[in-house]
Amino acid sequence: MQSRLSWIFNPKTGKTVMLAFDHGYFQGPTIGLERIDINIAPLFEHADVLMCTRGILRSVVPPATNKPVVLRASGANSILAELSNEAVALSMDDAVRLNSCAVAAQVYIGSEYEHQSIKNIIQLVDAGMKVGMPTMAVTGVGKDMVRDQRYFSLATRIAAEMGAQIIKTYYVEKGFERIVAGCPVPIVIAGGKKLPERETLEMCWQAIDQGASGVDMGRNIFQSDHPVAMMKAVQAVVHHNETADRAYELYLSEKQ
């Protein structure tokens, strides 16, 4: 377990920059992910960890790619129906066979299928403990729910109490440090919808400054006009403690 966790978090900084491109499991070929082999593969070398589905790992990610992989382990839903109605979509045997460093599943606290999503996390944690595979719980939010500190404090703590070793959640401007303080395992932030590059870097800096252990971003990287430059700027914030202003200057210089 600790060995795999050390693949995720840089031993010098204790932090990580994950590149998420698992969106197709419920969104299909969303903007920027139509051709992963063309648009996403050039970004691999600039990430600490990749996050994808086993289908994409097998069919698109080159076998020689020397990066740890977090495998999406929940699915069976789409944007056409209730998003929270997920099932475990990956066996632990396959996760081990594919040499993943962790498995990830959504947890939808307060949603119609809250109970099932928590059971999914428990199932993965139990199976993972037998083979030393960490589980990352990803806090999903229903469309009618308020994205605030109170909600994410509840969701992250429940996921940690169920045994998840890492939590992926959203940054909130008010009270994020309380979310981190109340969660006994590392938190990485999701990027969420596409923002202007300067705003994304500010969000990264604020999250790291308030105790996050890294970022797991997708659209704010691969939908950028200059994704490689954006990856380098995010790395500067997470691992080199650069401010958002300094990181944005780096982004501007790298995009030339």
UniProtKB/Swiss-Prot annotation:
Single annotated GO MF: transferase activity
Biological role: Involved in the degradation of phospho-AI-2, thereby terminating induction of the lsr operon and closing the AI-2 signaling cycle. Catalyzes the transfer of an acetyl moiety from 3-hydroxy-5-phosphonooxypentane-2,4-dione to CoA to form glycerone phosphate and acetyl-CoA.
Assigned keywords, A-Z: Cytoplasm, Schiff base, Transferase
Source taxon at top rank: Bacteria
Known EC number: 2.3.1.245
Protein name listed in UniProt: 3-hydroxy-5-phosphonooxypentane-2,4-dione thiolase
Cross-referenced Gene3D superfamilies: Aldolase class I
Top enzyme category: transferase
Reactions that this protein is recorded to catalyse: dihydroxyacetone phosphate + acetyl-CoA = 3-hydroxy-2,4-dioxopentyl phosphate + CoA
Record text on subunit structure and interactions: Homodecamer.
Active-site annotation: K168
Gene: lsrF
GO CC, one annotated term: cytoplasm
Entry's family note: Belongs to the DeoC/FbaB aldolase family.
Pfam families hit by this protein: DeoC
Annotated source species: Shigella flexneri
Compartment(s) where it occurs, according to its Swiss-Prot or TrEMBL record: Cytoplasm
